[in-house]
Amino acid sequence: MAEVSVQRILLLVVSLAKCLEGTKLLAHLKKCGDLECETLISRVLALRDYTGPDCRYLNFTTGEEISVYVKLGGDREDLWAGSKGKDFGFFPRDAVEIEEVFISEEVEMPTKSDFLCLLGEGYIFGSEQSELNSEDDEEHMYPYEKDEDQNYNIYEGDFQPEPDLYAAAEGTLLEDQIPASEAPDDFRFSSEWKAWEGAGSQGGGEQDYTADSDQDLPSLSKPERQGWFGLGTEEAEEKVFESDTEPTQELALEEESDLEKLHSGEPQVELEQEPKSETLEFSSVPDEEYELESETESILKPQASGWFGEGLTSYLGFGNEEAGLELLSKESNPPLQDIPSSVPPDEEVPAPCREISTDKEDAVINDSSVLSPSWFYYGFGMLGFTNADEDNIVSDKGENEDGEVDNLKHPIGSDFDPEKEQERKIVTVETEDQAGTESVLEKTDESGSMQYLKKFFDNPWGFQSLPEDTELPFSKKMLDQDDIVENDKIEELSTENSPTGSMKDPVMLASRYVLSDIDSEVELPMEEHEGVHFKPSSSKRNEDDSNSWADPEELSVAQTDGSAEGALLDTQLVSPKEHAADFQLLKYLLQIDVYGFMSSALSPIEILLESVVAALPEDMRADFNPSGFSLELAVCVLSVGLLAVVLFLWRGFRSIRSRFYVGREKKLALELSALIEEKCKLLDKVSIVQKEYEGLESSLKEASFEKESTEAQSLEFVEGSQISEATYENLEQSKSKLEDEILLLEEKLEEERAKHSEQDELMADISKRIQSLEDESKSLKSQVAEAKTTFRIFEINEERLKGAIKDALNENSQLQESQKQLLQETEMMKEQVNDLDKQKVALEESRAQAEQALSEKESQIETLVTSLLKMKDWAAVLGEADDGNLDLDMKSGLENTAALDNQPKGALKKLIYAAKLNASLKALEGERNQVYTQLSEVDQVKEDLTEHIKSLESKQASLQSEKTEFESESQKLQQKLKVITELYQENEMKLHRKLTVEENYRLEKEEKLSKVDEKISHATEELETCRQRAKDLEEELERTIHSYQGQVISHEKKAHDNWLAARTLERNLNDLRKENAHNRQKLTETEFKFELLEKDPYALDVPNTAFGREHSPYGPSPLGRPPSETRAFLSPPTLLEGPLRLSPLLPGGGGRGSRGPENLLDHQMNTERGESSYDRLSDAPRAPSDRSLSPPWEQDRRMTAHPPPGQPYSDPALQRQDRFYPNSGRLSGPAELRSYNMPSLDKVDGPVPSEMESSGNGTKDNLGNSNVPDSPIPAECEAAGRGFFPPPFPPVRDPLFPVDPRSQFMRRGPSFPPPPPGSIYAAPRDYFPPRDFPGPPLPPFPGRTVYAPRGFPPYLPPRAGFFPPPPHPESRSELPPDLIPPSKEPAADPPETQEA
């Protein structure tokens, strides 16, 4: 037993350690370039395309460069981490190739945490993966689910318990350590399945069935734990502030979807592989019950609250009590067929176990709708935040039985122990016997006041006084199955022995019933998660409860099923109206619920205490009493519980604040979208109003134009009347206003042009500066390149010097070695010389000895010779010896002197000795020769050795000198190397400083360039705005000019029509005047004739020579002057500036409107603006009248002219060129004259304006002058203006040449003598010469100079968008000289052309 306890404690410690450790690291070791992992390790090149499983991995394509900063170690050495641009993540090592290595020494360090991934599906952050991912999508993404590599499976690799632990521990312990939403489904279900199989092997058949029926329970862990710490689903967060029931609806919907996903996943397939059949309880449930369940679940679902339940909404007074009725049927639970509930057919299940399993399945069905994600599911109500309407969730009879409460609150593990199961059955039988009495007590306690008083006066201040139904289950994270079973046994015994546990107290029973309802409602999500199921009661209690129901169909359904499922369905079908009073009382009770708060605060401490006691060994646990536990354990448990409460309160506050923040963000987003929509609508309205305003403005302008045109049309010309002064003033004012506006527009245009020029200059300056900066940058780049090249040259020189130094050092070492070898050789030669000296000395000694022996021999020979000479007689006696033999005998006798002395008498013996002596002498001579040769050889060797020694000594001296030279050279090279290195360092420092300065300068230039770019951008924006404004102004000015031109044209048309009408009236008036004058002349003539006849009846035959008759076809005026009606008629108005005109047919300004020379600029400006030269008065004297409207005698008088003195009439220079102008296709008048204006001619003595006519006037004037005799004959030449010379004397009258100046051509009469000196311009106004005179008619000759008309240079037309300044008020417009036909007369002055 001690070993089992030790195993339990170790398992508990390991589970707590793994819970705290988490599984969020890919590897525990990593390699970096520095301690901060900020240094670039290497740069790699992608060999293939790669796409990571989640956002923590880096995606890249083939050929991209990646900077490596981190290399994972340990089991994940195949993963590196690096960046590509702005993206950072992990990538496999085999997908890249190292291109360049920056750091060879890497620092290995432990991995604290992986980086936080925010760009993918959600956070990859420890064990909160599922909660955070659940906000993004209902479908929970697992980062390791798609990876089949075993290295990626952190769940199976990080913590894998031993198989023997499953036999003694609950298999779901690992599931609690790893959140269900984070771990893969196959691992979670496989681990629990193994645990249940191991536990089921110790139990029995009923335990196996229970395990099979509960296989789907872990699937609810994911929606449950999604609500931990306030991290619910996204739907609940979005609608938490809209209503109190909407979060419940959204969470219930998500739970349904999660259940469907988990039931249809791999665990279901895994469980269904075994041959199983559905139990009778599940198969016996009819389809009507399923429909009733779905209906009741749709009612129960809104009662389940969000993260802390409906209790808070009821407690704070803002809950919605009837919100659950608003749910639709589609939000109910998934059907029963989604839940795997098959068991082996060969197993027989007892009735209590069958009831329990059926109730478990019912809990699974109902909890999927009632269950909502809470922020903590340890089974206690935080701050009493529980559901008030508990009758809709928990059955009325399963919660107020003492014996059943333990069974209702036990986890699954309690079903796996046969002994505990037998005890639980006994307790169940006892509690079923008490069902009748408790049902009566329940009926009596239904009143609200009893419940209120029972709960209010119940004593909550002790664990012993707490009823059994307040004991809450503990999480599977801390206990295994056996611990819970033992704990259940202790709780049952202590409850049965407690004084407050007796069932005889009705008040206590009722209070227990109420509290059990409240606690069961709070504990329902966790009970379902831990496998806690409702214990069914007897069918009698079901019948009693069903009697109070209103619906007979529901009663029948409830009564047909005696199981806990039917009871739970009956409880769910209770109408909310029946529990309205109870709910109201409970709501008031919750407002002062001190008991609920203390029970919820102390219940986890009690549970933790029981779990600790259950985890203790059996000997220690036998001595432990829950009523008298030790102080140290209590303090420890209390501290842990308080810490947990504070932690979860803080987390709840954070979750509430986050939800409020999300709601506020959504409200602000909605408000912002509404404001944006309103802004768009307002902008549309503004644009519509602006368009309407522009339309109204244009319509007002058109209306003003029409008004002015109607005013111009309303002008009526009366005989001899002019335009009214008021109309004239109005027109002048409007014209002055228009001129002022044009001036303002031109000033604005000039200002815009000046701004444009300034901006152009600024742009030019900026471009110059940019160019200069670019040149500077290029120069800096070139300098940097030069510095790099010089640096490279220095490096190359340094390398060369290093190579030369190495070569010199190698050569020096070789020389030193050769010197050493030579020294060794000299020593050896010295030794050989010494040996040879020794040999020489020995040879000399031997030579001396040989010489001494030789001298002795010679002396002996000499003695022998003497002795032989003495012995000549012997030779003669013997006769055998000769000279040669004698010598040999003598030599041999030297050796044997003694023998000779001893044997002086033997002659033969002497000869023998002589022969021997001779032989020995020969041998000695040979030896001597050999000694001589050896001595000569030794001498030769000695000489050779001396010579060799001398050569070696010379070589040694040369090598010594070379050594000294090399040493000096090496020293010089070292000094040079030091100097060069110093120079190199100095140059490097200088270059570095220069580079830093240039870099700073470049940065400053870049900053300046950025500022200049900003200025350029601003300038370009301003330029664009100015251009747009100028364009708008130009368009507006063009529109204004077009409107004004249209107005002027319309007015001119109307004035022309009025003028034509006035001219016809004037012609009629002239006809009448002519008729009157003719009649008056006839009358005077008749009177004169009558007087003459009275005086002289014969006077009629005398020719008429009266004064003044020459000038009138009707006779002279009686007063001798033209009639008063011959004044000039006004020309039609054109509504332009200037005074009234005389005639529209005088483009040169003849008559009153003529004036002196004018300015060319003004002329051109007036021409551009459409002003006429005949619109203004001049200072020159006016002509008496217009020729077209003057009487005939005026016309005849003007046609007579005289050439100047000394100039004949036949001179072609005096004849004016006829000018033809094309017909414009419409009636002639002011509008025609605006297009064809002639320039003024040079004048000598005064203004001599030319009178031109258009081609269209001839027809009209011919038609108008049809009443005048001799008028429709076309003239051959152009008539002159006011400068015609009158005839000085009455010539002989001839037929007149009628001239109509309004026709296309004019005729010239024949030459006439020049006039007498007098007025060179014209005759005086009082002078009227006689009309009738004999002779040819007077030629019409204008009073002009003899010079040809001079063409004026054209004025350069303005460019597009430019309007000329306003003209001088005295200026007038004339026809441009390009419209003047070329003159055939020689020009006096050449034309001057102005070119811009």
UniProtKB/Swiss-Prot annotation:
Q: In which tissues is it expressed?
A: Isoform 1 is expressed in liver (at protein level). Isoform 2 is highly expressed in liver and weakly in testis.
Which residue ranges run through the membrane?
Answer: 629-649
Q: Which UniProt keywords apply?
A: Coiled coil, Endoplasmic reticulum, Glycoprotein, Membrane, SH3 domain, Signal, Transmembrane, Transmembrane helix
Q: Quote the biased-composition stretches of kind Polar residues, using this chain's numbering.
A: 1252-1269
Ranges of compositional bias, category Pro residues: 1331-1342, 1351-1368
Q: Where is the composition biased (Acidic residues)?
A: 243-258
Which residues are glycosylated according to the annotation?
Answer: N59, N366
- Tell me which parts of the chain lie in the Lumenal compartment: 23-604, 626-628
The intramembrane regions are: 605-625
rRNA-binding in keyword set: no
Residue spans making up a coiled coil are: 693-867, 914-1082
- Keyword Metal-binding recorded: no
Q: Which GO terms describe its cellular component?
A: endoplasmic reticulum exit site; endoplasmic reticulum membrane
**Region Proline-rich domain (PRD): what ranges?**
1105-1396
Q: Where is the signal peptide?
A: 1-22
Documented effect of changing F90S: Decreases expression of isoform 1
Region of interest (Disordered), ranges: 197-288, 331-361, 396-421, 525-557, 1103-1396
UniProt subcellular location: Endoplasmic reticulum membrane
Membrane topology according to the record: Single-pass membrane protein
Q: What is known of its domains?
A: The proline-rich domain (PRD) contains repeated PPP motifs. A single PPP motif is necessary and sufficient to mediate interaction with the COPII coat subunits SEC23A and SEC23B. The coiled coil domains mediate interaction with MIA3. The first coiled coil domain mediates interaction with PREB.
What interactions and quaternary structure are annotated? Interacts with MIA3. Interacts with the COPII coat subunits SEC23A, SEC23B and maybe SEC24C. Interacts with PREB; recruits PREB to endoplasmic reticulum exit sites. Interacts with APOB.
Quote the protein name from its UniProt record.
Melanoma inhibitory activity protein 2
Q: Which organism is it from?
A: Mus musculus (Mouse)
Q: What is the lineage of its organism?
A: Eukaryota, Metazoa, Chordata, Craniata, Vertebrata
Question: What gene codes for this chain?
Answer: Mia2
